[in-house]
């Protein structure tokens, strides 16, 4: 276990996919969400639950092993900022559920999105993004990253000509959400993947609201041309599911050919800050995830805590069960709102009149969109009166909890946007965002009716 030989291409074992035990079986999603990453009990104690490895550092057997690990010649934990054994189970499990090559868990969904963009784009580069996205991501792209020299053009992703015209020579990625936040609009993943790959750039998709149980964006790329290359999650939402823990996950699909593109030297050329390693040579299909862990996470440190990783794993074990109930309740609420005399419009793709209804049927055969908006008749006053008199729904900024949630986007989650930008994102003064939980549907509907009584 000596140091990596000069000029060799070390095997970066820090970026492991799920184990061969699970890979060699054709297990279903519901089984994978319980077992990937920990197919056997803890070897030290026999514990069946994933242990919480609450430590910052790891003891090396000797100087030779320490040198080998720091030189990336040997796999294993080095320091808690980069890896942790609880974290590793979460990474492998989400990567397997998304059918990706590697996963990386970080401190929050915002960190996952930031790292995914920073990995491909440098000062002077450009991103094309869907315009109807989460307000925090919009602000990241429109303001924060712009200050570091990364420009973004926001487009109507349903207008392919507009997307094509937005792509420049310096464009490094197209960014989407499988279900737009907050209006649940749906991009045509296959068409946009083809467009991105035609320009030799990756398609990055936030699948927080879709979840791998309802849609796997990478799988639409079975022939490489028709799916996402990178998937990001705010694991805080449906993956955790209980509003207890912050976390984010990046999944490297392993489908994008960084070498053939010739536009991403950070992955293909020797990196002077890491022993001259080329990440495509060292990590192969997991080069993107490897680069983020070894460089961005190392240097900026948005690491997930072992305890949060454990809590997110607990949520992940029931993802399919919860999503079935979320979707069932949501469709009942959509039907209720669509018929309500105090509702001006319901923005949900399950409705036949919704502009994305055909895409909903194509990409979400199990249903989807538990987070959506509707417009109450009236203005901001009526919207806020409705919200303030709900009793079961909690008024807070989170979504995708087992508890039903509500918020007024124009004055909260999307308040940073100008009024013009809000309108382009589908946010109006009378827009209300709902996140439908898993309570009994009769109680949910009764609470909504109670709110309407105070909004007349």
Tell me what each language-model feature is.
Residues 99, 170, 342-345, 392, ...:
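Glycine-centered tight turns that cap/initiate beta-strands
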Residues 62-111, 136-143:
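Conserved N-terminal alpha-helix of the aminotransferase class I/II PLP-enzyme fold
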Residues 300-303, 307-309, 318, 323-325, ...:
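Conserved small-domain helix->loop->beta segment predominantly found in fold-type I
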Residues 6-21:
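Short, Lys/Arg-enriched N-terminal segments with co-localized hydrophobic residues
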Residues 23-53, 250:
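Short conserved active-site loop signatures built around small residues
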Residues 16, 101, 142, 169, ...:
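PLP-dependent enzyme catalytic core of the Aspartate aminotransferase-like
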Residues 23-24, 41, 102-339:
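Conserved PLP-enzyme active-site core in the AAT-like
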């Amino acid at each position: 276990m000596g140091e990596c030989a000069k000029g060799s291409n070390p095997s970066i074992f820090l970026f492991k996919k799920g184990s061969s035990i699970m890979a060699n079986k054709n297990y279903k999603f519901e089984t994978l969400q319980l077992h990937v990453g920990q197919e056997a009990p803890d070897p030290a104690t026999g514990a069946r639950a994933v242990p919480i490895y609450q430590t910052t550092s790891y003891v090396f057997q000797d100087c030779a092993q320490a040198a080998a690990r720091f030189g990336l010649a040997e796999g294993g934990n080095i320091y808690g900022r980069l890896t942790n054994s609880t974290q590793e189970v979460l990474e492998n499990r989400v990567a397997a559920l998304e059918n990706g090559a590697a996963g990386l868990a970080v401190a929050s969904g915002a960190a996952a999105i930031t790292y995914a963009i920073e990995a491909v784009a440098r000062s002077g580069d450009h991103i094309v993004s869907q315009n109807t996205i989460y307000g925090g991501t919009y602000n990241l792209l429109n303001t924060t990253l712009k200050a570091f020299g990364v420009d973004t053009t926001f487009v109507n992703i349903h207008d392919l000509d507009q997307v094509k015209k937005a792509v420049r020579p310096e464009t490094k990625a197209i960014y989407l959400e499988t279900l737009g936040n907050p209006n649940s609009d749906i991009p045509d993943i296959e068409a946009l993947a083809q467009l991105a790959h035609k320009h030799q750039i990756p398609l990055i998709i936030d699948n927080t609201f879709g979840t791998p149980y309802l849609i796997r964006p990478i799988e639409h790329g079975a022939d490489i041309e028709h799916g996402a290359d990178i998937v990001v999650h705010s694991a805080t939402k449906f993956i955790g599911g209980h509003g207890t823990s912050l976390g984010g996950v990046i999944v490297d699909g392993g489908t994008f050919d960084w070498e053939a593109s010739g536009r991403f030297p950070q992955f293909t050329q020797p990196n002077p800050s890491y022993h001259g390693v080329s990440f495509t040579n060292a990590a192969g299909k997991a080069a993107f995830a490897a680069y983020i862990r070894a460089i961005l996470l190392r240097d900026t440190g948005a690491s997930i805590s072992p305890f949060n990783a454990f809590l997110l794993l607990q949520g992940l074990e029931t993802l399919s069960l919860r999503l079935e109930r979320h979707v069932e309740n949501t469709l009942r609420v959509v039907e209720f709102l669509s018929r309500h005399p105090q509702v001006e419009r319901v923005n949900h793709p399950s409705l036949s009149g919704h502009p994305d209804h055909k895409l909903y049927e194509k990409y979400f055969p199990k249903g989807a969109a538990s987070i959506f908006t509707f417009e109450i008749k009236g203005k901001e006053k009526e919207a806020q009166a409705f919200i303030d008199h709900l009793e079961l729904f909690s008024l807070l900024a989170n979504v995708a909890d087992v508890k039903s949630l509500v918020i007024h986007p124009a004055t909260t989650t999307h308040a940073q946007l100008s009024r013009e930008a809000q309108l382009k994102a589908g946010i109006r003064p009378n827009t209300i965002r709902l996140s439908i939980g898993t309570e009994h549907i009769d109680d949910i509907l009764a609470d909504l009716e109670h709110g309407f009584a105070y909004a007349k």
